[in-house]
Amino acid sequence: MLAPATNDMVIAARGVTLALGDAAAPTQVLRGIDLEIARGSSVALLGPSGSGKSSLMAVLSGLEQATAGQVLVDGLDFGRLDEDALARARRGRIGIVLQAFHLLPTMTATENVAVPMELAGERDAFARARAELEAVGLGHRLTHYPAQLSGGEQQRVAIARALAPRPALLFADEPTGNLDARTGTEVMDLLFARREAAGATLIVITHDARLAERCERVITLGDGLIVEDRAA
């Protein structure tokens, strides 16, 4: 059995396998992954399409249960938690920023950040939402709806939504994929700055080698395996 994660390791995974598709002939998308990630570090996941990057993120973030192996996140064995307990564990520990912004069009920027926290029973949800939106440079857009915001501004709202609950772990899956080069650089500057201010561990999925080199560690996947693990 995997030893409990130490204070220095926010993620500890051993023998993680994920099989998807037909039970009679499943597709192995992760093949015995062993991985530890230090608390407060920044890690890039590289690899071609189909290499297992998004699947690994899904397992590490609790969105998907591993077929075999063990994943400890902040000392908790996600595989041993029932659905409700897993949802509670993820809520306080994990933030996710995706390529698609996934903002609700009928809610203002503030509401898009605050309402998920409010539904989770968080105190001062709207005050925290406003503070985080100020921090990402959107203090003048608090009452704007997504349709009134540029792509870069919408991604800033998504970053604020992910960081406002103060997660220990922040996952970003191709967060600049829908943005032009200049806006993408600005958003990544912001993402790195805000995660550092929050003390969160950052795991970024990207095809962009330049973005990967901004992280402290680069892990390359191929065919469901880690094929390279190096300092940036």
Question: What role is predicted for each listed range?
Answer:
Residues 1-19, 227-232:
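ABC-family P-loop ATPase nucleotide-binding domain
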Residues 9-221:
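ABC family nucleotide-binding domain
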Residues 218-230:
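H-loop (His-switch) and adjacent beta-strand-loop-beta switch element
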